[in-house]
UniProtKB/Swiss-Prot annotation:
Source organism of the structure: Conus marmoreus
Highest taxon in the source lineage: Eukaryota
Name of the featured protein: Conotoxin mr5.1b
Residues making up the propeptide: 20-48
Keyword match Disulfide bond: yes
Alphabetical list of Pfam families matching this protein: Chi-conotoxin (PF16981)
Tissue: Expressed by the venom duct.
PTM annotation (4-carboxyglutamate): residues: 60
Main localisation: secreted
Phylogenetic lineage: Eukaryota, Metazoa, Spiralia, Lophotrochozoa, Mollusca
Length: 65
């Protein structure tokens, strides 16, 4: 009967412990791109599709993006 309070206290301590990501980072781990970077990349892709092929000046003058 003496073990029950100790067991309950241990359970409470384990449940309140902060969670930690136990996985080690490797050299292959890369951070996910932010949503700002995704939007910027999408707008750049759309701008490249709108540009005149073979004449780069039409893209340089278009600063509306």
């Amino acid at each position: 009967m003496r073990c029950v309070p100790v067991f309950v206290i241990l359970l409470l301590l384990i449940a309140s412990a902060p969670s930690v990501d136990a996985r080690l980072k490797t050299k292959d781990d890369m951070p996910l791109p932010s949503s700002h970077a995704n939007i910027k990349r999408t707008l750049q892709m759309l701008r490249n599709k709108r540009c005149c092929p073979g004449w780069e000046l039409c893209c340089e003058w278009d600063d509306g993006w």
